[in-house]
From Swiss-Prot:
Pathway: Cofactor biosynthesis; biotin biosynthesis; biotin from 7,8-diaminononanoate: step 1/2
Protein name according to UniProt: Dethiobiotin synthetase BioD
Main localization (coarse): cytoplasm
Organism: Mycobacterium tuberculosis (strain ATCC 25618 / H37Rv)
EC number per UniProt: 6.3.3.3
Length: 226
């Protein structure tokens, strides 16, 4: 059994499509997969990341706790809706209930690593510590990514949360000078596990499966679950 939290260097970097791609690659390797997103914001505009993972990767074990209408940080979205954030133990129980032998459980955060997900001030990093999970960090290839990535990895290391690697959430075709340079530099910071092509979320399920299998190293994926 393996729990992996999927975080990012910010909002809109591609965490959901990375969750879906890794889930698809794992399922194609014969691994049972569950995906959890404890907190979802932006439901008023139709945001539903778990449904997107199900559509792209065919995962049926999908779990969430709190949903807020406005596309804001969870604490702000909850306040705007007159609702509360979930409690820390609720999130931990949700993840623990999904975890089982032979299964890869992916936990997608909201925004970046230190965004408040539960009261009082509980972040995805805290949850990772609670469930003994490593973190896969979704990054961009854009200017500024090196600083954002290093800050995220330092925040993980400060609480002894191991980094399972980096994934570039949207890789341009063709890559420009900045993107190509940043990809090389990112690989010197941590292992780059995959670079997903820009627009991957628009693929149909069959093409998405093929892309996912090609994007990740099969041996690494197979080794995620002991």
């Amino acid at each position: 059994m393996t729990i992996l939290v999927v975080t990012g260097t910010g909002t809109g970097v591609g965490k959901t499509v990375v969750c879906a791609a890794l889930a698809s690659a794992a399922r194609q390797a014969g691994i049972d997969v569950a995906v959890c997103k404890p907190v979802q914001t932006g439901t008023a505009r139709g945001d539903d990341d778990l449904a997107e993972v199900g559509r792209l990767a065919g995962v049926t074990q999908l779990a969430g706790l709190a949903r807020y209408p406005q596309p804001m940080a969870p604490a702000a979205a909850a306040e705007h809706a007159g609702m509360a954030l979930p409690a820390r133990d609720q999130i931990v129980r949700l993840i623990a209930d999904l975890d089982r032998p032979g299964r890869l459980t992916l936990v997608e955060g909201a925004g970046g690593l230190l965004v408040e997900l539960a009261e009082p001030g509980v972040t995805l990093r805290d949850v990772a510590v609670d469930v003994a999970a490593a973190a896969l960090v979704v990054v961009t290839a854009d200017l500024g990514t090196l600083n954002h990535t290093k800050l995220t990895l330092e925040a993980l290391a400060a609480q002894q949360v191991s980094c399972a690697g980096l994934v570039i959430g949207s890789w341009p075709d063709p890559p420009g000078l900045v993107a190509a340079s940043n990809r090389s530099a990112l690989a010197r910071i941590a292992m780059v596990r995959a670079a997903l092509p820009a627009g991957a979320a628009s693929l149909d399920a069959g093409d998405f499966a093929a892309m996912s299998a090609a994007a990740f190293d099969r041996n690494w994926v197979a080794g995620l679950v002991g």
